[in-house]
Amino acid sequence: MIALIQRVRRAEVRVGDRVTGAIDAGLLALVCAERGDTDAVADKLLAKVLGYRVFSDAAGKMNLPVQNIDGAGRAGGLLLVSQFTLAADTNSGLRPSFTPAAPPDEGKRLFDYFVAAARAKHAIVETGEFGAEMQVSLVNDGPVTFWLQTRA
């Protein structure tokens, strides 16, 4: 399972003219399930997303997770957006292959599981809409972007 996380000042996702999720300071995570991923793999990735230290402490070092973005216990927002294209195989030719991505039904199940688990562990969780054409707007903070990937 893959998450491309970006530290943001704010971010929102729209489907058509409807905002489906919006956060202030926190993380935007583009999330993709790969073939063979399980709930355990999703749990492992979520622990990494929630614990990854990408926010600056008082000394200016990236030392704080989204659950404590100011060092005083304030949680940042977590905007989760499904994006199967992260699993693309780009090794041959000029057209990506999406064979490594989980099939749509399994991808949706794992994304929904990931969102539910995130909501159980984190105060501020917003989402896009699985399988929809979405427009994502964000203001990067840094920019700070990391590719996180977990496997069984």
Swiss-Prot record:
Motif range (Gly-cisPro motif, important for rejection of L-amino acids): 142-143
Domain of life per record: Bacteria
EC class: hydrolase
Catalytic activity: glycyl-tRNA(Ala) + H2O = tRNA(Ala) + glycine + H(+); a D-aminoacyl-tRNA + H2O = a tRNA + a D-alpha-amino acid + H(+)
This protein's UniProt keywords: Cytoplasm, Hydrolase, RNA-binding, tRNA-binding
Domain remark text: A Gly-cisPro motif from one monomer fits into the active site of the other monomer to allow specific chiral rejection of L-amino acids.
Record's function text: An aminoacyl-tRNA editing enzyme that deacylates mischarged D-aminoacyl-tRNAs. Also deacylates mischarged glycyl-tRNA(Ala), protecting cells against glycine mischarging by AlaRS. Acts via tRNA-based rather than protein-based catalysis; rejects L-amino acids rather than detecting D-amino acids in the active site. By recycling D-aminoacyl-tRNA to D-amino acids and free tRNA molecules, this enzyme counteracts the toxicity associated with the formation of D-aminoacyl-tRNA entities in vivo and helps enforce protein L-homochirality.
Subunit structure of this chain's protein: Homodimer.
NCBIfam families with a match to the protein in the record: D-aminoacyl-tRNA deacylase
Protein name: D-aminoacyl-tRNA deacylase
Record organism: Paraburkholderia phymatum (strain DSM 17167 / CIP 108236 / LMG 21445 / STM815)
Gene: dtd
